[in-house]
Amino acid sequence: MYISNLRLQNFRNIPAKSFDFKNSINFIVGKNGSGKTSILESIYFLSHSRSFRSSQLNRIINHNADEFIIYTKAYNPDEITISLSRKKNSNNISKLNLEIQKNHTEITRNLPIQLINPESFNIINSGAQQRCKVLDWGAFYLDKTFLKIWQQTKFLVKQRNSALKQNYPYSYILSIDKKLCEFAEILDYKRHAYFTKLKPKIYEILSHFNPNLQLDIDYFRGWNLHKSLAQVLEESFNYDNKYKVTNHGPHKADIVLSVSHKPIQDIFSRGQQKLLICALKLAQGEIHNSENDNKCIYLIDDITSELDSIHTLTLFNYLKQLKSQVFITTTEKNKINEFIDTNSYILEI
């Protein structure tokens, strides 16, 4: 998959603009506020139907308009078109090859995106939910049945929490538990299948960045490995009932990062943590590319301000080896001069 043309209308501070890109590394150079990150944001929005910068639509729509439109022409290898429009207080419209979509799932499948930006480096210090999204992204593309299992599991956890809050009888909770355990086991299997591919790939890429970094990467399914979920839910019911929330289950899954059983945030420097996240994101894209025909697209925002020159060079050299389209923003062209070659494309805005 690669994007050849992107058209934006009333997206952020871009009233109307068309951009052409190459199926290689595309550098977007501009001052702060010039709109370079907005280009990455629009591509991300096309894939996810949401922004990585704001959850408020009014902030994304140009202040002089009531609607924004994003359109792209891409190849996979055949030509496809994706477009969406978002209006204030109105219905959303998403189209794939000119056909209106009931939901965004097929567009997401057709446009896999990996984002590396300053907020990405918070994955290590944020809660388990953010790290679990890493597993769910990969499993979604690896297994077409994953989404329905994930949606049903999420619904059952929500239903159980609601029943706890409303003091429903224990017999009713047990009826939910029976269904939840069934779907949770399947979800755990699919997540673990993806994790077994992800873990060695992270180690492999990390060795290119810093061969001296040592860490343990483990998968936690959300409940005791040596007990069934049914047993755990039964044993923890009084605690769950007291706090009116389900404390164990697939919604508590996590990727545990440690060094000698200590959290890596207590061991790794900030720079080492950033390298790990870069390795994780690259690993996700590589696994996707090996399992799917539509190649993952990388969006990398202002990375030169996050990594030193040596590690930036290592990252860029690694990106050049990938058969993926890459978008990289920077405020200073001189910071990327040594990375530019004949296959690169530079957009100055």
UniProtKB/Swiss-Prot annotation:
Fetch the InterPro entries from UniProt.
Answer: DNA-binding_RecF, DNA-binding_RecF_CS, P-loop_NTPase, RecF/RecN/SMC_N, RecF_2
Q: Name one GO biological process term.
A: DNA replication
So which domain of life are we looking at?
Bacteria
| UniProt keyword DNA-binding, yes or no | yes
Q: Where does ATP bind?
A: G30, K31, N32, G33, S34, G35, K36, T37
Subcellular location as annotated:
Cytoplasm
Disulfide cysteine pairs (residue numbers): none
Q: Which Pfam families match?
A: SMC_N
Single GO molecular function: ATP binding
- Chief subcellular location equals cytoplasm
Keywords in alphabetical order, please.
ATP-binding, Cytoplasm, DNA damage, DNA repair, DNA replication, DNA-binding, Nucleotide-binding, SOS response
Q: Which GO terms describe its cellular component?
A: cytoplasm
**Family listed:** Belongs to the RecF family.
Query: Which HAMAP family does this UniProt record tie to the protein?
Result: RecF
- Free-text function comment from the UniProt entry: The RecF protein is involved in DNA metabolism; it is required for DNA replication and normal SOS inducibility. RecF binds preferentially to single-stranded, linear DNA. It also seems to bind ATP.
Q: What is this protein called?
A: DNA replication and repair protein RecF
Record gene name: recF
